């Protein structure tokens, strides 16, 4: 059984036991999380009906908090001596999917 969930403005295909990296979620490692925005569930039959999907929940636990790769930003304006250098690392959360409720 797998589900497609939406979190942090992105969609992820998850199954029980998967570890996914999502935008930072509040909580400490070991805390339980519910991914309620389920877009599709496929098990014995495919479910796409919004009324049925409202009952489905994907549960997981926070495995770790990490950072994404370093992104370097360099702004430059010609003939003025203006240089601005900046770096960014996006905070991420690793979530281990522990279950997908069928909502029946």
From Swiss-Prot:
GO MF annotation: an example: rRNA binding
Pfam families: Ribosomal_L21p
Biological process according to GO: translation
GO cellular component, as recorded: cytoplasm; ribonucleoprotein complex; ribosome
Claim: S-adenosyl-L-methionine is one of the keywords in the record: no
Job of this protein: This protein binds to 23S rRNA in the presence of protein L20.
Name of the protein in question: Large ribosomal subunit protein bL21
Encoding gene, per UniProt annotation: rplU
């Amino acid at each position: 059984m797998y589900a497609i969930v939406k979190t942090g403005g992105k969609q992820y295909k998850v199954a029980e036991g998967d570890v996914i990296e999502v935008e930072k979620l509040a909580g400490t490692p070991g805390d339980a999380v519910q991914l309620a925005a389920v877009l599709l569930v496929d098990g014995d039959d495919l479910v796409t009906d919004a009324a049925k999907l409202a009952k489905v929940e994907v549960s997981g636990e926070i495995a770790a908090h990490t950072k994404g790769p370093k992104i370097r930003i360099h702004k430059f304006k010609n003939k003025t001596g203006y240089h601005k250098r900046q770096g960014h690392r996006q905070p991420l959360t690793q979530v281990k999917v522990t279950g997908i409720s069928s909502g029946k």
